[in-house]
């Protein structure tokens, strides 16, 4: 939540906006409140919803400059407020606040120059003041004005004739708003006419300054105005303030620690919505202020006397005259008439018996006759806080025809909200565009006449009407009325209709049959709106004949709201109406017999002033009505009828259905996940097929039947109704139904039937409504019948049916609220919530982690649901329905509100994180971080809060369960629990189950956090947060367990103390007696207890209860179901833990020795336990208790009873004497005040009007501090001196009277001036201040100072007017008498205090020796030992201090050395850093150079590669040339062939040997050679280069040849095989490798010779193939064996020739 402002002035009144996150939606039908929590005050202000996530409110004023916590609470109907967010606002003290405080304090000290001097401390100029005009008004509005403060500075009616006032100051500063505000304050009207010391009025100043606006306002001013704010004090801690400028109502509560937030919000809502009551209350508060604060010309002395007496002149007039005078319209003296009306209402409120006598008088007119009144509302109320005994509100009165009456009921007809310029006493005429109202018959209203009330009415109407509409949609009006007709006829008079209340509901438009609206005066804690609507009875208006037939129709209405907050108020509305005396028919609906209204109840509220017979007649009338209501006939009829229809109500109509989304079974509360499911066609309930028998009954059928059986009446619902035709005249039924309760959703909005009898369904509805109203309006005591029994009797339904009705009526809004959050987390896991495609993209650990986080949020929702069930279903029902005491309910549900608030805040934090983690849509989310929320929840303030509330809740678990079982013995409570358990909202969880679930909740957190931690990556921030959160949770659980254990031990200790016999005791070793009373110290606590065995001297064992306390070990023995101190071997059963040693018993694993080494004497006990573990546990706990036991023994042992009784008796005697002396002092002060009063009366009788004496002493008897009499004595001495001066002055005046202008006058003046010097006010003030402040009445110093100042002023006047010396002397005597009497009272009180102090000192002195004597030598020895030990410890402390100082100096030296080393290291590091920087720069330069060289190298490498490619091309060219040369040589050597014999064996062997020696030789047959030659000699027709390949041959053959050559080279170990392969290859079509085409087959011989002279590289020859020389040598050795194979070649095949 973000606030739009962070700093505001103290007076507030700034608009603030609270903006929530985008995912937060603020419901439109909810209420929002801003809570401002300060250190001493809390303010509650309503907020408006301006957007979906934005709230607007007005910041209230605050009295202290501090930072307050601002929280926003959501309040919906039906459950507790929820805190949605919080922030902070700082209140600052600005210049306007300081200037306002200065104006209030300096109001009576102003001078004509104050408008300049007051601005000096603020450094302000007159030109800058207009900007502060409005802020000054707001600051003054917020200030708490002193009691009796006025604009003139004091509350006295006697003011100076010439005086500067705040109005003069406002005019001089030209501040019109401040001027208007001051004019509304007390004394403002008087100050308007008061001239200042310059004889100038505010009007003259305005004229002189040219302030035309102020001049016009002053000239048109006709009386006192109402200020812009109203403040109402509810009690000493709560105050309501209404600001008309902002139309804001603020509730301010002091001592926020003592008030619950929920209670403060309910209190605010109570007054905010009950507007009629608030208008009257604020009006009475304004009148009280006017009665106590004089305001000037508008109030005369007679009016003040009327206000004091509580009566007004109008009370003596007749009612008819009063109505007539009001109907005549506004007179010339409008303000005076308004004041008279104010006093009339005020006197009517203050009169104790007025409402009762008025009610009785009106009711007694039923049998005796009287004026014809159609509707007269009498409201009898009790308001505890404001002491208003009753409120009589009378509204609009009209006399209309049937047509005009229908027009008044139109939507725009009657408006009680006055426009701002409308006088509150003006006529409120009901007008319509289609229908006209008879002007002669129209009458004016009787509304509260003051402008204060009207303004408040207007502002409330404008501000709260929109919110009221939403509540009117939800709540129906309730009307309790009974109809009976009058018994006698009377004369017909014009009807008068009074509309109740101060504000009319905007909803009208009723049908013409029986037109009736309701008055809802409920003041229940939830939102209640006091609505008043027009009341009309068409039966009296249907024809003109009914107006002239002499029929008398009367209506009596007594309305009262339901009980709220323990205050009971009686509500009964009776309306008696009939059309004629002959047409009488009584038909009343009846509640159960236990709800009958007795006649005695009405006697307490209605006290008639008529004769006794009339009283009995009225009582019989009411008794008759009540008896008709409780007739047993209709009850039996309805019971039989409901029994027959019972089965039909419970049946569903299930149909098979398929559902999209996740739904819940209504029978087993499990999720419907794709199983075969059923759905009811009526109520849409979903269930499994196997659970259909367990589903609760169908609510839709019940609702239909309930709606059919509704009474055909109008109950003030807000729905639009059909108006019947105007020509149809309907006579209503004499019976008038009782309305449904305000919380019910359904309203009966149908017209009456024409029949005058009431059917059974109407009786049933009537009985149900009466039951609801009675159950809600009962007192705090338990009713005899439960709500469930009444519903069973009225409707005859089963408990399950009733539970559904209860859900629909009471818990529907709460159920929708719970289900909204539950639907999001009702799936079984996270993987089922998100989209499958989104889930499949996540890792396995992420899915498992999200499942656990989802489970954490899901279980948190369930926990909040459990808490809400406990709060709203059980606790609220116990308080409202069962009317249980709040303390009893809080014992069953301790700390429930705090638990709910804490867990809601925790869940909202997780929910907000879930919304922030959404990706793509709202369904897909991955929460990556949850540890920070867990750490925040379980650390700091939240952790301490959870420890406290869970500690309290778990500690009181057993107590709550025992109290619940005790309450279950009551049948009424059993029925209540049965109904609540059957509620769907409770989910079949009872109170024990809910309490157990809450206590187990904190144990679930560690398991869930450990599982989240298991799937979180280590060494991450989230992992660290989760580890920390896990530790915090475990610490919290341990703290809760410890608190529960301590509470249980404390409870057990209290139980044991209660079982200890009061008279039991034991004697200690030092001779002191130890009794039970010594155990009741708050410092002692139970550490451990258990049953042990004390071994006696004879070897026997005695069962003993051992109690280990904080300072002693106690052994108790049970006797007659009581505990006494154990008596074994005459040893004391109380062992001090000081110097107690526990040792094991040798050869006994279950025994231990307890050795007490006390100074009084050692003692040893042998104690045995049941097991070795138990003994070890005892020894360990005793050792821990000894270590933590305090060392001092004083105060642990008990004193003797005799000494204690004596001391108590002396103290009681001293207190008694002190009370007697205080009473005597009070009587003395009273007698002295009575004497002063008598003297004052004697002074008035003596004829001296100028003499004035206050008949009160200057001190008050204070039992705490005695008054200081020194100041009173000094004042009395100065008063005596002034009296002496006055006497001398009178004598000298008598002597010097003949020669007034002579030298005696100068002598007199000198004498007076010399004698006046010691008694000057300055010297007096300094003397009193030098003595310090007085501990007496705070007004004493001011009064004494005023006396001295007045004396000084009178002495100044004595010099000028010597004729008044006698009055001055008498005045001085009176003042001196008052001072002397005050001094006497002070001395009396001081004497009493002195005597009491003497007795106290004697008591202390008498107790001191006894204490020292009781200690004896043992205590002296102990003291000396402790002193010695103390000295040793002190010496050790000094030694440790010296060592500490040495270590500290050594540490300082070490620190200095380390600091120097660090500085040197730092300087070296800085130098090293500079060197590194230079090296880095050098390296960068080298790197740039290397980069440049690399670039050049790459360029050179590219050029080298290009050269290599050129060399390769050149080398290829050279190969081509070599091939050409070889071809030429081959052609040239054909003439020189080498001839071999084909069959020579030598040649063959030689060829094989040569072929093995030459690896790169080629064998070409003559066929290939001839083919090549022939091919080379042929022309090339295409011009393409010649190819050495045969026609049709592929390049693959060359590859095969090369492979064959490589095989020959690698495997020379098998010459035969290789040779055969070579021959085979040589016979095949082989071709040289890489031969290019030959353009010219013959080259010149020079090229050939040059080629032969070259000697190529062996590597190149290997790569290129066989060299020419090798080929030549091979050619010489080639055998001619191929001649036989080439015989087919022709003639040339005789020899084989190999050519190069």
UniProtKB/Swiss-Prot annotation:
It is found in: Cytoplasm; Cell membrane. Residues 1493-1524 are annotated as: RNA-binding. The modification Phosphoserine is found at residues 312, 314, 478, 623, 1535, 1604. The lineage of its organism: Eukaryota, Metazoa, Chordata, Craniata, Vertebrata. CDD domains: C1_p190RhoGEF, PH_p190RhoGEF, RhoGEF. Phosphorylated on tyrosine upon stimulation of cells by laminin. Residues 1294-1303 are annotated as: Interaction with PTK2/FAK1. SUPFAM superfamilies: Cysteine-rich domain, DBL homology domain (DH-domain), PH domain-like. Residues 728-737 have a biased composition (Low complexity). It comes from Rattus norvegicus (Rat). The keyword Acyltransferase does not apply. A zinc finger (Phorbol-ester/DAG-type) spans 651-698. Residues 1085-1187 form the PH domain. Functions as a RHOA-specific guanine nucleotide exchange factor regulating signaling pathways downstream of integrins and growth factor receptors. Functions in axonal branching, synapse formation and dendritic morphogenesis. Also functions in focal adhesion formation, cell motility and B-lymphocytes activation. May regulate NEFL expression and aggregation and play a role in apoptosis. The gene is Arhgef28. Residues 1473-1522 form a coiled coil. Residues 1563-1576 are annotated as: Mediates cytoplasmic retention and interaction with MAPK8IP1. Keywords: Cell membrane, Coiled coil, Cytoplasm, Differentiation, Guanine-nucleotide releasing factor, Membrane, Metal-binding, Phosphoprotein, RNA-binding, Zinc, Zinc-finger. Its main location: cytoplasm. This is Rho guanine nucleotide exchange factor 28. Residues 848-1043 form the DH domain. Residues 1421-1700 are annotated as: Interaction with microtubules. Homooligomer; forms cytoplasmic aggregates. Forms a complex with MAPK8 and MAPK8IP1. Interacts with RHOA. Interacts with microtubules. Interacts with YWHAE and YWHAH. Interacts with PTK2/FAK1. Interacts with NEFL. Interacts with CTNND2; prevents interaction with RHOA. GO terms for molecular function: guanyl-nucleotide exchange factor activity; RNA binding; zinc ion binding. One of its GO terms (cellular component) is plasma membrane. Residues 1193-1207, 1633-1642 have a biased composition (Basic and acidic residues). Residues 709-720, 774-783, 1613-1623, 1647-1672 have a biased composition (Polar residues).
């Amino acid at each position: 939540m973000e606030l739009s402002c962070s700093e505001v002035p103290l007076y507030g009144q700034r608009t603030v906006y609270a903006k929530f996150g985008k995912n937060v939606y603020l419901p439109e039908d909810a209420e929002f409140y801003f809570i401002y929590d300060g250190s001493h005050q809390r303010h509650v202000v309503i907020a408006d919803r301006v957007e979906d996530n934005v709230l607007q409110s007005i910041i209230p004023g605050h009295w202290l400059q501090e930072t307050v916590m601002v929280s926003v609470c959501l309040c919906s109907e039906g459950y507790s407020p929820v805190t949605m967010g919080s922030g902070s606002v700082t209140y600052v003290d600005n210049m306007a606040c300081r200037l306002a405080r200065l104006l209030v304090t300096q109001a009576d000290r102003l001078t004509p120059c104050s408008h300049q001097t007051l601005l000096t401390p603020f450094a302000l100029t007159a030109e800058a003041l207009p900007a502060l005009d409005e802020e000054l008004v707001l600051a003054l509005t917020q200030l708490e004005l002193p009691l009796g403060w006025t604009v003139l500075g004091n509350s006295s009616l006697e003011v100076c004739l010439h005086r500067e006032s705040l109005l003069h100051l406002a005019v001089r500063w030209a501040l019109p708003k401040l001027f208007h505000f001051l004019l509304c304050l007390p004394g403002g009207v008087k100050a308007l006419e008061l001239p200042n010391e310059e004889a100038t009025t505010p009007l003259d100043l305005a004229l002189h300054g040219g302030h035309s606006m102020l001049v016009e306002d002053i000239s048109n001013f006709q009386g006192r105005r109402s200020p812009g704010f109203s403040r109402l004090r509810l009690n000493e801690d709560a105050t309501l303030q209404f600001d008309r400028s902002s139309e804001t109502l603020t509730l301010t509560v002091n001592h926020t620690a003592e008030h619950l937030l929920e209670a403060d919000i309910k209190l605010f809502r109570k007054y905010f919505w009950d507007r009629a009551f608030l208008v009257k209350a604020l009006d009475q508060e304004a009148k009280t202020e006017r009665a106590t604060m004089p305001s000037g010309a508008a109030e005369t002395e007679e009016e003040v006397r009327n206000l004091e007496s509580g009566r007004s002149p109008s009370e003596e007039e007749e009612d008819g005259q009063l109505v007539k005078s009001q109907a005549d319209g506004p007179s010339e003296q409008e303000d005076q008439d308004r004041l008279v009306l104010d006093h009339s209402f005020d006197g009517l409120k203050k009169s104790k018996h007025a409402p009762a006598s008025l009610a009785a008088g009106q009711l007694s007119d039923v049998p005796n006759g009287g004026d014809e009144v159609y509707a007269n509302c009498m409201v009898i109320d009790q308001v505890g806080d404001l002491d208003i005994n009753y409120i009589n509100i009378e509204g609009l009165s009209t006399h209309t025809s049937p047509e005009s009456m229908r027009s008044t009921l139109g939507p725009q007809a009657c408006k009680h909200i006055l426009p701002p310029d409308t006088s509150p006493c003006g006529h409120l005429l009901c007008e319509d565009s289609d229908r006209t109202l008879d002007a002669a018959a129209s009458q004016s209203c009787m509304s509260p006449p003051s402008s204060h009330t009207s303004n408040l009415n207007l502002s409330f109407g404008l501000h709260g009407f929109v919110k009221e509409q939403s509540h009117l949609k939800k709540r129906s009006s309730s009307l309790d009325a009974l109809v009976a007709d009058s018994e006698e006829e009377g004369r017909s008079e014009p009807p008068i209709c009074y509309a109740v209340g101060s504000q009319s509901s905007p909803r009208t438009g009723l049908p013409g049959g029986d037109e009736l609206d309701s008055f809802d005066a409920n003041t229940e804690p939830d939102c209640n709106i006091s609505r008043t609507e027009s009341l009309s009875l068409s039966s009296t208006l249907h024809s003109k004949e009914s107006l002239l037939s002499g029929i008398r129709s009367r209506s009596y209405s007594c309305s009262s709201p339901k009980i709220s907050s323990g205050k009971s108020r009686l509500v009964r509305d009776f309306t008696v109406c009939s059309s004629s005396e002959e047409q009488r028919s009584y038909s009343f609906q009846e509640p159960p017999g236990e709800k009958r209204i007795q006649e005695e109840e009405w006697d307490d509220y209605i006290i008639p002033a008529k004769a006794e017979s009339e009283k009995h007649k009225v009582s019989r009338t009411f008794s008759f009505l009540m008896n008709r209501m409780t007739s047993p006939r209709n009850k039996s009829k309805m019971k039989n009828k409901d029994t027959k229809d019972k089965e039909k109500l419970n049946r569903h109509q299930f149909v098979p259905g398929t559902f999209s989304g996740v739904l819940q079974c209504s029978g087993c509360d499990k999720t419907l996940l794709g199983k075969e499911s059923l759905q009811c066609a009526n109520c849409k309930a979903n269930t499994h097929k196997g659970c259909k028998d367990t589903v609760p009954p169908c609510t839709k059928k019940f609702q239909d039947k309930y709606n059919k059986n509704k009474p055909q009446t109008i109950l003030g619902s807000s729905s639009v109704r059909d108006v019947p035709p105007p020509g149809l005249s309907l006579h209503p039924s004499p019976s008038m139904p009782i309305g449904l309760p305000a919380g019910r959703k359904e309203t009966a909005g149908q017209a009456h039937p024409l029949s005058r009898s009431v059917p059974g369904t109407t009786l049933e509805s009537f009985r149900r409504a009466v039951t609801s109203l009675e159950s809600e309006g009962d007192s705090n005591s338990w009713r005899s019948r439960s709500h469930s029994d009444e519903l069973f009797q009225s409707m005859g339904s089963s408990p399950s049916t009733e539970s559904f009705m209860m859900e629909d009526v009471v818990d529907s809004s709460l159920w929708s609220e719970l289900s909204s959050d539950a639907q999001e987390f009702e799936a079984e896991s996270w993987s089922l919530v998100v989209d499958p495609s989104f889930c499949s993209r996540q890792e396995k650990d992420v899915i498992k982690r999200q499942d656990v986080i989802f489970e954490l949020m899901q279980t948190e929702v369930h926990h909040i649901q459990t808490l809400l069930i406990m709060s709203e279903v059980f606790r609220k029902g116990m308080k409202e329905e069962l009317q249980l005491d709040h303390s009893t309910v809080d014992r069953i549900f301790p700390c429930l509100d705090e638990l709910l608030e804490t867990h809601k805040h925790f869940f909202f934090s997780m929910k907000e994180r879930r919304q922030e983690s959404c990706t793509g849509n709202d369904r897909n989310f991955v929460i990556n971080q949850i540890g920070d929320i867990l750490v925040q929840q379980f650390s700091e303030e939240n952790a301490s809060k959870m420890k406290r509330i869970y500690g309290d809740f778990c500690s009181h678990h057993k107590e709550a369960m025992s109290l619940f079982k005790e309450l279950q013995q009551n049948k009424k409570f059993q029925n209540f629990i049965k109904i609540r358990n059957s509620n769907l909202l409770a989910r079949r969880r009872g109170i024990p189950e809910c309490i157990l679930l809450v206590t187990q909740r904190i144990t679930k957190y560690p398991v869930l956090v450990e599982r989240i931690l298991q799937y979180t990556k280590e060494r991450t921030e989230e992992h660290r947060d989760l580890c920390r959160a896990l530790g915090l949770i475990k610490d919290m659980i341990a703290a809760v367990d410890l608190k529960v254990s301590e509470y249980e031990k404390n409870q057990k200790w209290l139980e044991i103390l209660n079982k200890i016999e009061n008279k039991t005791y034991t004697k200690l070793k030092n001779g002191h007696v130890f009794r039970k009373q010594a155990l009741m110290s708050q410092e002692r606590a139970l550490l451990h207890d258990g049953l042990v065995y004390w071994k006696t001297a004879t070897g026997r064992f005695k069962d003993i209860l051992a109690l280990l306390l904080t300072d002693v070990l106690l052994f108790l023995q049970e006797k007659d179901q009581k505990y006494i101190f154990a008596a074994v071997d005459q040893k004391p059963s109380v062992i001090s833990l000081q110097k107690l040693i526990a040792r094991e018993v040798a050869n006994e694993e279950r025994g231990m020795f307890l050795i007490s080494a006390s100074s009084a004497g050692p003692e040893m006990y042998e104690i045995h336990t049941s097991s070795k573990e138990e003994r070890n546990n005892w020894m360990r706990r005793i050792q821990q208790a000894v270590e933590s036991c305090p060392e001092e023994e004083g105060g642990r042992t008990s004193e003797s009873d005799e000494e204690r009784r004596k001391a108590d008796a002396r103290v009681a005697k001293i207190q008694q004497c002190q009370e007697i002396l205080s009473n005597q002092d009070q009587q003395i002060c009273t007698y002295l005040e009575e004497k002063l009063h008598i003297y004052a009366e004697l002074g008035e009788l003596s004829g001296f009007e100028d003499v004035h004496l206050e008949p009160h002493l200057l001190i008050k008897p204070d039992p705490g501090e005695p008054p200081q009499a020194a100041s009173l004595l000094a004042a009395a001495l100065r008063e005596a001196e002034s009296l002496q001066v006055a006497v001398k002055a009178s004598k000298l005046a008598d002597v010097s009277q003949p020669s007034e202008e002579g030298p005696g006058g100068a002598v007199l003046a000198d004498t007076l001036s010399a004698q006046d010097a010691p008694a000057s006010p300055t010297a007096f003030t300094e003397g009193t201040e030098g003595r310090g402040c007085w501990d007496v009445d705070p007004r004493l110093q001011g009064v004494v100072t005023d006396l001295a100042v007045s004396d000084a002023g009178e002495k100044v006047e004595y010099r000028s007017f010597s004729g008044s010396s006698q009055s001055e002397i008498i005045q001085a005597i009176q003042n001196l008498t008052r001072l002397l009497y005050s001094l006497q009272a002070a001395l009396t009180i001081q004497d009493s205090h002195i005597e009491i102090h003497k007795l106290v000192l004697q008591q202390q002195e008498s107790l001191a020796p006894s204490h020292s004597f009781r200690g004896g030598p043992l205590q002296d020895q102990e003291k000396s030992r402790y002193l010695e030990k103390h000295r040793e410890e002190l010496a050790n402390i000094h030694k440790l201090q010296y060592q500490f100082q040495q270590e500290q100096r050594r540490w300082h030296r070490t620190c200095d050395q380390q600091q120097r080393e660090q500085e040197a290291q730092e300087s070296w590091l800085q130098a090293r850093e500079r060197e590194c920087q230079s090296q880095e720069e050098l390296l960068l330069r080298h790197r740039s150079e290397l980069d440049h060289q690399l670039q050049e190298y790459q360029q050179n490498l590219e050029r080298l590669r290009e050269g290599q490619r050129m060399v390769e091309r050149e080398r290829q060219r050279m190969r081509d040339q070599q091939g050409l040369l070889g071809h030429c040589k081959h052609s040239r050597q054909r003439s020189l062939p080498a001839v071999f014999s084909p069959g020579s064996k030598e040649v063959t062997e030689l060829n094989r040997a040569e072929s093995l020696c030459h690896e790169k030789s080629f064998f070409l047959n003559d066929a290939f050679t001839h083919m090549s030659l022939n091919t080379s000699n042929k022309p090339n027709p295409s011009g393409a280069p010649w190819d050495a390949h045969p026609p049709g041959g592929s390049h693959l053959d060359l590859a095969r040849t090369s492979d064959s050559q490589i095989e020959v080279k690698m495997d020379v170990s098998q010459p035969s095989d290789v040779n055969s392969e070579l021959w085979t290859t040589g016979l095949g079509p082989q071709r040289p490798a890489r031969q290019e085409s030959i353009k010219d087959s013959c080259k010149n011989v020079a090229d050939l010779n040059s080629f032969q002279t070259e000697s190529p590289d062996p590597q190149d020859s290997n790569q290129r193939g066989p060299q020419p020389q090798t080929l030549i040598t091979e050619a010489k050795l080639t055998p001619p064996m191929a001649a036989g194979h080439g015989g087919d070649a022709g003639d040339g095949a005789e020899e084989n020739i190999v050519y190069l």
